[in-house]
Every structure is written in C-alpha cells, then in structure tokens.
C-alpha cells in the first residue's frame, strides 16, 4: 500500500476516535486554562455552571469529564490534521503516478477540493466522505 494511502487510512481511523460531541468544537469552543471547552450554550466571559461547580471542595465529576475529554479530543484532532497536512503535500504527486488504489484514487484526480481541510473535524469528515464513499 502506498505511503499516501496509509496516511489517509490513519487519518480516517483517528477521526473516527473523536467523540461526536467534538465535531463542532472548532467553531463553538475555546481554550480555558489549557483545556478546550464547548461554549456553544454559554455567553461570552462565562462557563457553564455544571463545568465550574465544585462539590465538597473538589472538582465536580462533570469538570473532570470535560478535562479528560478535552485532552483526548485535542490530541486526536491535532494528529488527524497532521495526517491531512502530509496527505495534501504528496497527494497530487501520488495520484499522477497512479499510486493510489481505485478505492479513492480516482476521486482525487477529479475533485482537487476533496482533501482541502481547513476548519473543523466536521469539515474533515465531510471532505473525507467525498473521497471514501463508505464513510457516508
């Protein structure tokens, strides 16, 4: 299997590990104390009550879940985008040499925007679906 195809497969696998709730974090979240928080339902300058609430002087279970979720999500998103960056660099060269398998290689030669990954994991998934129909 060519290197580019391996990288794309790795990106797809990593993407599927990102929890569904994270798909909109790129546009509806922010970094707070080093952690990514979903702020889609929060006014600017505040955090959800359940996130900041403390129980008996210790962090609530919700806060712990958010922190854990943030760590894994940001790691997976970063790795996924790194994979896509590598793909974008070598994609057309590989496609021209016919190194990509028919499973998605032909789509790449006709749709240059397929792997134009720019914003959120949601766009990442949408673009990968153009390339690999089985993801739909």
UniProtKB/Swiss-Prot annotation:
- May I have one GO cellular component term? mitochondrion
- Kindly state which keywords UniProt assigns to this record, in alphabetical order: Mitochondrion
**Cellular localisation:** Mitochondrion
Q: What is the protein's given name?
A: Uncharacterized mitochondrial protein AtMg01300
Major localization listed first in the record, in broad terms: mitochondrion
Other information: A stretch of 270 kb of the mitochondrial genome is duplicated within the centromere of chromosome 2 resulting in the duplication of the gene. The expression of this duplicated gene (At2g07692) is demonstrated.
């Amino acid at each position: 299997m060519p290197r580019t195809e391996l990288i794309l497969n790795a990106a797809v696998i990593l993407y599927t590990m990102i929890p569904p709730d994270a798909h909109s974090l790129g546009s509806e979240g922010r970094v707070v104390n080093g952690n990514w928080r979903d702020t889609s339902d929060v006014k600017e300058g505040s955090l959800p009550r359940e996130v900041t609430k403390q129980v008996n002087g210790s962090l609530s279970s919700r806060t712990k879940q958010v922190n854990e979720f943030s760590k894994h999500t940001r790691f997976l998103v970063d790795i996924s985008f790194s994979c896509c960056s590598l793909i974008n660099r070598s994609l057309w060269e590989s496609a021209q040499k016919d190194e990509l398998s028919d499973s998605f290689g032909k789509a790449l030669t006709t749709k240059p925007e397929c792997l134009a990954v720019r914003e959120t994991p949601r766009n990442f998934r949408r673009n990968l679906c153009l390339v690999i129909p089985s993801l739909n």
